[in-house]
């Protein structure tokens, strides 16, 4: 009986851990595929942290004032495999980011592609399944 109870408790614990991990990586939990964005601005900061990287860019608003957007990207390891280096996004670099805005309407988004001022384009490492179909 005790072994059976231990097995059930372990199974429930494993199920809860799996559900948490899945929810963490669910695009639809945070971002809206019906809110595609294109924002152009200057890099303020690039955080190469796990499990996701963050690019902070200043985008000029309609009133001419800078608004900081936080763009989520793949893990540093994935970005390096896609052609990024630690020197790819120094502060001041002008970029265009395509992605999807947060469901709460904040200036936060998941990025799909970055285009540099010279026309070079890099993929931010999130699959089509994560960022919406056909985007």
What are these regions (language model features)?
Residues 102-126:
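OB-fold/S1-family single-stranded nucleic acid-binding modules
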């Amino acid at each position: 009986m005790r072994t059976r109870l231990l097995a059930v408790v372990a199974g429930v614990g494993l199920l809860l851990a799996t559900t948490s991990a899945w929810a963490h990586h669910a695009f639809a939990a945070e971002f809206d595929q019906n809110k595609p964005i294109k924002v152009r601005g200057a890099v303020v900061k690039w955080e190469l942290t796990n499990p996701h990287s963050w690019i902070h860019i200043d985008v000029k608003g309609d009133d001419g004032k800078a608004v900081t957007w936080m763009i989520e990207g793949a893990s540093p390891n994935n970005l390096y495999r896609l052609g990024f280096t630690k020197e790819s996004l120094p502060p001041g670099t002008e970029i265009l980011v395509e992605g999807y805005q947060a469901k709460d309407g904040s200036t936060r988004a998941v990025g799909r592609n970055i285009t540099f001022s010279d026309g070079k384009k890099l993929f931010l490492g999130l699959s089509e399944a994560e960022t919406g179909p056909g985007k």
